[in-house]
Amino acid sequence: MTKRRVGIVFGGKSGEHEVSLKSARAVMNALDPEKYTVIPIGITRNGQWLSGGDPLLALEQQADQKMLGRTPQAGVVSETAIVQSAGSLPEQTNVAALDVIIPVLHGPFGEDGTIQGVFEFANLPYVGCGVLAASVGMDKGLMKSAFAAAGLPQVPWQLVLRRDWQTQPEAVYERLEATLHYPMFVKPANLGSSVGISKVSNRAELATGMAEAAGYDRRIVVEQGINAREIEVAILGNDDPKPSVPGEVLPANDFYDYADKYLEGQTQFAIPAELDAATSEQLREMAVTAFKAIDGAGLARVDFFVERETGAIYINEINTFPGFTAMSQYPKLWEATGLGYSELLDRLIDLAIERYHERGR
């Protein structure tokens, strides 16, 4: 059997750089060496593309690029590195020879349609959502608008531009307090993994949370906090997506933050979640609706709130390339549904190639 050549792209310029490295390590360890030849391709924080040697180890150790045994071209960016591969990547990693790419990238420049557009331009099969779905799924404001159009219920929320907050902070605070009540969650519109998110209970905390979020993005989403269970559903597929069993996040702190997700926090998970059959099925159906609402492909994780007092379900967000570490919910949800980690990767690669041929029709 001819092995498929799989390019694993990781790192990147976003605030989720370290998360990407953890996910990439797990993916590379899980790919069956009898089926695949793995070609690691790293992206530094300043956008340089690295290959040859061990770029993942180099980025993990924050080592000098000389560790790779070569000096990458200064300022190499997406289009140059991918399309003109001979000029920026060693011959043995010519991306034109790859059968498929897994962009194990989270956040801006990786999960937001940017790199997906590069792969489309270069006519390369890749795992995951296309340009449109990735873009909408990354921006919480656009995502929420798509969910509203699909009829999915959400908690009240407001979008704030960083410039408005910087020039008229008191007016912004008054608008938020008039439309929402404390506690609120303040989030950068274009980051995931709970990076830059704050739970705020008064105006002083709101000001601090706005400053934190504004450090990451020019668009800030502020949501109404509710007393709710956090439920997640994994999605797998293209035009006929399938949902996993629901799982519940049991955070040790006020909310499921970055430290709990990736730094061996105290958060626990219940998979499958303890839900009645009707609620479980409704969550799974809503997850599929959300995936289709953004024209998703390959994979996603859809997060929900289930209000404790009423049982009402609200969609929170969709993650178009969720974390893939050993601690991550997405592979755990599929394992509980009957699909192991390595088999999940096999299926994602098949879906990427199927979608590539579908686009070529």
Swiss-Prot record:
GO terms for molecular function: ATP binding; D-alanine-D-alanine ligase activity; metal ion binding. It comes from the Bacteria. Its EC number is 6.3.2.4. Mg(2+) 1 binds at D303, E317. It is an enzyme of class 6 (ligase). Residues 144-350 form the ATP-grasp domain. Disulfide bonds: none annotated. Mg(2+) 2 binds at E317, N319. Cell wall formation. This is D-alanine--D-alanine ligase.
